[in-house]
UniProtKB/Swiss-Prot annotation:
BP GO terms, sorted: mitochondrial electron transport, ubiquinol to cytochrome c
Name of the molecule in the record: Cytochrome b
Assembly behavior: The cytochrome bc1 complex contains 11 subunits: 3 respiratory subunits (MT-CYB, CYC1 and UQCRFS1), 2 core proteins (UQCRC1 and UQCRC2) and 6 low-molecular weight proteins (UQCRH/QCR6, UQCRB/QCR7, UQCRQ/QCR8, UQCR10/QCR9, UQCR11/QCR10 and a cleavage product of UQCRFS1). This cytochrome bc1 complex then forms a dimer.
Name of the gene encoding the protein in the UniProt record: MT-CYB
GO terms, molecular function: metal ion binding; ubiquinol-cytochrome-c reductase activity
Length: 379
């Protein structure tokens, strides 16, 4: 008798995606981050749902409702900090996942890559709106500064900003709509994840060698389910360490002060995972130029398949490209550090240099070095 998981219409989908899925036998731990992102998304949806049961999206009560969650709700403090620090883990996994795609040439799977970029943008939008909800000082001023960037769009900019605000400043209408969007977007993200996996399973996974995996594949279960479970445990350990011992390590002290439109904090900055883009935005003195650079810093990922000049898909056997990849990683760390510093020298000039290096590496230096490597290999 045929196993029910292979014939039942619903179970067949699960079976072909997570049990009998033919998987390359040599994919390394860098491939674990896809499943970890799924775990992070599930955690965010569950904790977010419980927070939404107690949160009120009103300027008068939002801050006190978050305080109420932390003080009066059973394990409310834990749910809140799991949600806040879970977002940090989510972005850490996202950046590593994208980095792995760049290093091993997974961007050649164009549909999967493009849906991935859409996912990255959607997750960033969701996280930004979530940061506004506690209605602390940094929530309010972060929302004001970031939404104000749209006013740089010629002709329609100012009207667009007021339309997003629902008035002439960030106020009750803004908070209500941000909560509505923050609630619905994770479910849209879940749908996009399914499309991401659909396209991935059409072509099959890439592997560290960058060659065809067809001659040597193994079933996903039990090999990679066990491996993913180990990855999840190793992710939970630092997350729980953060939540239970250092819950405010990655937050901003200003967000423990209720939002006050009459008092601007000395340094307005977003959460750590947006600091690299924020540093690029600040490194250009012109408002429109800064906004374009900010958008380009993410959307540049979409043109990476067009910039591929290497004859080998993976960087596994390309030491020069490997060095440049890690220079790019170090550059992004530098930008993250600069984004959290005040706007004064030497931070301004370091930020400008790091921003120029970021775009130069992706657009010019890495494609050129790939061509040199082709010549060295006589290809």
């Amino acid at each position: 008798m045929t196993n029910i998981r292979k014939i039942h219409p619903l179970m067949k989908i699960m079976n072909n995606s997570f049990i009998d899925l033919p998987t390359p036998s040599n994919i390394s731990s860098w491939w674990n981050f896809g499943s970890l992102l799924g775990a992070c998304l599930a955690l965010q949806i569950v904790t977010g749902l419980f927070l939404a049961m107690h949160y009120t999206a009103d300027t008068m009560t939002a801050f006190s409702s978050v305080t109420h969650i932390c003080r009066d709700v059973n394990y409310g403090w834990m749910i809140r900090y799991l949600h806040a620090n879970g977002a940090s883990m989510f972005f850490l996994c996202l950046f590593i996942h994208v980095g792995r795609g760049l290093y091993y040439g997974s961007f050649t799977l164009s549909e999967t890559w493009n849906i991935g970029i859409t996912l990255l943008l959607t997750v960033m939008a969701t996280a930004f709106m979530g940061y506004v909800l506690p209605w602390g000082q940094m929530s309010f001023w972060g929302a004001t500064v970031i939404t104000n960037l749209l006013s740089a769009i010629p002709y329609i900019g100012p009207n667009l900003v007021e339309w997003i605000w629902g008035g002439f400043s960030v106020d009750k209408a803004t908070l209500t709509r941000f909560f509505a969007f923050h609630f619905i977007l994770p479910f849209i993200i879940t749908a996009l994840v399914m499309i991401h996996l659909l396209f991935l399973h059409e072509t099959g996974s890439n592997n560290p060698l960058g060659i065809s995996s067809n001659p040597d594949k193994i079933p996903f279960h039990p090999y990679y389910t066990t491996k993913d479970l180990l990855g999840a445990i190793l992710l939970i350990l630092p997350l729980m360490n953060l939540v239970l011992f250092f819950p405010d390590l990655l937050g901003d002290p200003d967000n423990y002060t209720p939002a006050n439109p009459l008092n601007t904090p000395p340094h307005i900055k977003p959460e750590w995972y947006f600091l690299f883009a924020y540093a690029i935005l600040r490194s250009i003195p012109n408002k429109l130029g800064g906004v374009l650079a900010l958008i380009s810093s993410i959307l540049i990922l979409a043109i990476i398949p067009l910039l591929q000049t290497a004859k080998q898909q993976s960087m596994m056997f390309r030491p020069l490209s490997q060095c440049l990849f890690w220079v790019l990683a170090a550059d992004l760390c530098t930008l993250t550090w600069i984004g959290g510093q005040p706007v004064e020298n030497p931070f301004i000039s370091i930020g400008q240099t790091a921003s120029i290096l970021y775009f130069s590496l992706i657009l010019i230096i890495m494609p050129t070095v790939s061509m040199i490597e082709n010549k060295m290999l006589k290809w």
